[in-house]
Each structure stands twice: as C-alpha cells, then as structure tokens.
C-alpha cells in the first residue's frame, strides 16, 4: 500500500509535536497553570494530522486490496466526516477531557486557566502546524522547503542586520535584543529569498515570490515575538534545553505562525 504525499512530514511532526506540547506544559506550569499533557498531546497530533488522515482514507478506499475489514471501516467513517467539523470536535473533546483530568485534583482553583492553557497548546501546536500538510498534499516537497527557507532566512537576516546596524529597540519590554533595523532587514532578506526561489518554480512570477517572502518574513518574526511573550510570562529564557537551540518551541516559533498564511496565499494564487 502506498501512502499520501507528506507522510514523512506527518510522521516527523507526530514525534516533534508531543515534545513541544511538553515544553508548553512546563511553561504554563511556571505560571501555576496545570494542563493534561496526555490530552493535549493526543489532541494536537490529531488536529495536525487530519489532512493526511483524510487523504490516507481516500487512498485506502480507492485501493482496498490487502486492507483489513477494520481498516476499511475506519477509512469509510473518516471519509464521511467533514474535515472542518473534525478539528472543532477534537478541540471540544480535548477541552472536556482536560477539565475532567483537572477535576481529579478535587479543586476548583485554576479550572478556567487549565481550559485556556489546554486550548492554547492545541491551537498553537496542533492546528497551526497542520496547515503544512494540505500544502504538501497539493504541492511538491520543494514548496515546504521554500516556505521554511523564507521564514528562517528572515530570522537570520534579522539577527545579522540587528547585530551590525541595530539601534532602535523594537519592543524593549518584550524582547530587548530585537531592533527595528533587524526586523526590517529580516523581512527584506525573506523577500529577496522569495524572489530567488521563483527561479526553481516557473509557475510563480518573481514579484509573487517577493510578496510571499515579505509576508512570511513578517509572520515568522511575529511568531518569534509570540513565543518570547510566553517565555517572558513564564520567566524563562529558553523553552527547553536542546544544546545550541534552546528548545523545540524555539525551533518551531517562526514556522508555526507562517503556516496558515502560506496556505491561504497558495489558495489565493492557485485556488
């Protein structure tokens, strides 16, 4: 049996997302917000995987030879479920499950914070990265690489320009090291990379690549600032202790916010 495009991405994220959820749970714990890691991990992975699971069920129904009756039954059920109903259903079930796990403490203090923290983890680490899978299902792996290159080049450009020319602080109370010069330099770097990448994608004009790079560069840096906000609130410098990187969340922060923007840009251009 063959598997849908993006299987490698799906399996990689199915491993990485629980690690990121664990780091998010630790950040929330610093603020005395206790969430169920198990509930949030399972829910985040399901929300992230739904486009791939939908495609897998279609392929299984189109080529059922060798599949077990149970697999066919599950694929048939999944195929009848509208995807835009599945994610809200998972989130609602996760909310009930998280509050149910919280009630085992036999305390009411922090129930609303638990609910909010659980949904934050699921949306941030399940729904947002899930946009990369429909992109991969409709485009080549090179498209995913291009998106990540634009986002990460914005990070590197912001760091380099900020170090060389940074004078005016961007948001000193949130991220003292970031400057307006670095912010603009990072966006410009992503725009240049986006224009250059169109050389390998003839279906896009250079100006479309430039606009995509500029927008994804902005989103990537906003994603970095969003994670800085969470870490500042928790009172920590890094989300984890991965040598040389900090934590899994520190690696994912910029690509996460860029994912839905990239998806809708491609929908606008290609339909």
Where do the language-model regions lie?
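Transmembrane alpha-helical segments of integral membrane proteins
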Residues: 100, 222-237
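Hydrophobic side chains within alpha-helical segments
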Residues: 26, 158, 227-230, 253-256
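Juxtamembrane boundary at the C-terminal end of a transmembrane helix
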Residues: 264-271
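Hydrophobic alpha-helical segments of membrane proteins
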Residues: 160, 187-196, 218, 222-229, ...
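Membrane-embedded alpha-helical segments of transport systems
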Residues: 154-157, 184, 249-259
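Interfacial loop-to-transmembrane junctions
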Residues: 232-255
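Membrane-embedded alpha-helical bundles of polytopic integral membrane proteins
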Residues: 1-214
């Amino acid at each position: 049996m063959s598997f849908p495009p993006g299987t490698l991405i799906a399996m990689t994220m199915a491993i990485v997302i629980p690690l990121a959820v664990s780091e998010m749970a630790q950040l929330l714990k610093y603020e005395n917000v206790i969430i169920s890691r198990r509930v949030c991990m399972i829910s985040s992975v399901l929300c992230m995987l739904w486009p791939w699971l939908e495609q897998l069920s279609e392929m299984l129904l189109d080529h059922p030879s060798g599949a077990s009756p149970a697999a066919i039954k599950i694929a048939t059920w999944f195929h009848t479920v509208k995807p835009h109903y599945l994610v809200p259903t998972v989130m609602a079930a996760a909310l009930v499950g998280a509050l149910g796990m919280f009630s085992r403490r036999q305390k009411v203090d922090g129930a609303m914070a638990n609910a909010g923290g659980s949904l934050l983890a699921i949306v941030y680490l399940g729904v947002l990265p899930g946009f990369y899978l429909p992109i991969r299902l409709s485009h080549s792996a090179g498209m995913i690489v291009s998106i990540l290159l634009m986002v990460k080049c914005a990070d590197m450009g912001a760091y380099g320009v900020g170090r060389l020319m940074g004078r005016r602080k961007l948001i000193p109370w949130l991220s003292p090291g970031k400057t307006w010069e670095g912010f603009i330099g990072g966006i410009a770097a992503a725009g240049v990379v986006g224009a250059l990448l169109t050389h390998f994608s003839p279906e896009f004009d250079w100006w479309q690549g430039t606009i995509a790079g500029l927008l994804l560069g902005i989103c990537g840096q906003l994603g970095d600032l969003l994670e800085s906000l969470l870490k500042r609130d928790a009172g920590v410098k890094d989300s984890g202790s991965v040598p040389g990187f900090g934590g899994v969340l520190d690696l994912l922060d910029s690509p996460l916010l860029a994912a839905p923007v990239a998806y809708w840009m491609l929908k606008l251009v290609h339909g």
